[in-house]
Amino acid sequence: MEKKDIVSYNYDELQDEIKSIGEKPFRAKQIYAWLHEKLAEEFDEMTNLSKALREKLDQAYEIRKVKVVAHQISKVDPTEKFLFELEDGNRIESVLMKYNYGNSVCISSQVGCRMGCRFCASTLDGLERNLTTSEMLRQIYQIQKMTGERVSNVVVMGTGEPLDNYDNFVKFIHMLSDEHGLNISQRSITASTCGIVPNIHRLAGEGLQITLALSLHGSSQEKRKKLMPIANKYELSEVLEACDDYYKQTGRRVTFEYSLVAGVNDGPDDVKELTGILKHRNCHLNLIPVNPIKERDFKKPDSKKAMEFQNKLEKNGINVTIRRERGSDIDGACGQLRRRYGAVIEERPDEDICED
C-alpha cells in the first residue's frame, strides 16, 4: 500500500487522520508542529512521541523529500538559487532573496509549465505535472533549514502557473499562513498568473489577502497574443475585468508585471496603450527587463531606454517601478538552472489551454 503524504494534510485533516489510527487528537498538534514549525524530515526526530507511535506513523505515512542537487550563491547580491529533486526524479527551482525588511523566497508551483510564454525558459519543456501542496511547502522549509534564515515573504513566481494547479495552490496558501505552522501573513504572499480568467474570479472569492500579480507583458490584445499563447483563449478585456473583480472582492491592489522586450513592447505606442489600460485602476506596474535565454531571440532594452519608458509612464500618472535584477550571475531566470542540470531538452508545442 502506498504511504500517504502527511505534509499535505492541513491541521484539521491531520486531526482526522490521527483519530483514524486510534490516537488522541492532541497528538495531531504535536505532529503538525514537528512537520511545519520544526521542519522534521523523519518521524524519528519527533522525540515527544512514543517509539510505537513513530513506527505506526512510518508504516502509514511518509514525509516526502525535496532534495537539494544544486545550490548557487550570487557574488553580486544576497541571492541564492536552489535546484531541488523530488522523489520521482523531477526537478524544480526556488530562489532566496535577502532584503533589509526580511527574506523572500520565490517558489515553483509545477514541474515545467504549459502556458508557453515566448520569453520564459520554464515553458520550453512543457508541463510534466503539478506540484503537491507538500512539495510547494517543502521548498520553503528546505531553504529555512539549509540557510538558518527565517522566510518572511513568499512569491509564487517560479516555474509553473499556480492557477493551473488551483486546489493545491490555495491549500498551500492556507497552510503557509496557518498559525500552527510558519504563520506567514497572507499579505506577505504574492502569486503570479498569466491570466486564467475563471480561476482569477474563483480566487477573488476565496477570502484570501494575498497580492495578485498579473503577467501583462503586452499593451494590447494583439501584442499579448504574440508573446503569450494564453491570450488566444482569453481577451485582454476579460483579464482586466477579472483583476478588477479581485480588487473589488479583496481590497488588494493588483500588480501588473510587464517584461520589457527590446523592439517588441517598449515603444511610444506601448506607453500610450498601457496608460489607457492602467490610469484609472488602483494598481502597480512592475517593469521587468527580459532575461535573455539561449533558446529565444529576445533581448532586453538598455537601462537608459528602460528608464525613459518608466519616466513616460510616470508622467502619465502610472504607479510604476523597474524591478531590480537579482542573481544575474547564477541562472536567475525561471527554468534556467533546471535545464542546465539535465532536464529534457526537447521543446514541446503549446498545450490545450493555450489554444483557440
PLM-predicted stretches and their roles:
Residues 1-92, 244-253, 258-356:
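Auxiliary Fe-S-binding modules of radical SAM enzymes
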Residues 30, 110, 136-139, 310:
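Glutamine-centric residue-chemistry signal
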Residues 80, 92, 103-107, 115, ...:
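Generic beta-strand structural signal
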Residues 144-153, 158-316, 320-323:
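Conserved AdoMet/S-adenosylmethionine-binding subsite of the radical SAM
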Residues 88-102:
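P-loop NTP-binding catalytic core
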Residues 123-153:
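Conserved alpha-helical substructure of the radical SAM core
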Residues 98-135:
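Canonical Radical SAM [4Fe-4S] cluster-binding loop centered on the CxxxCxxC motif
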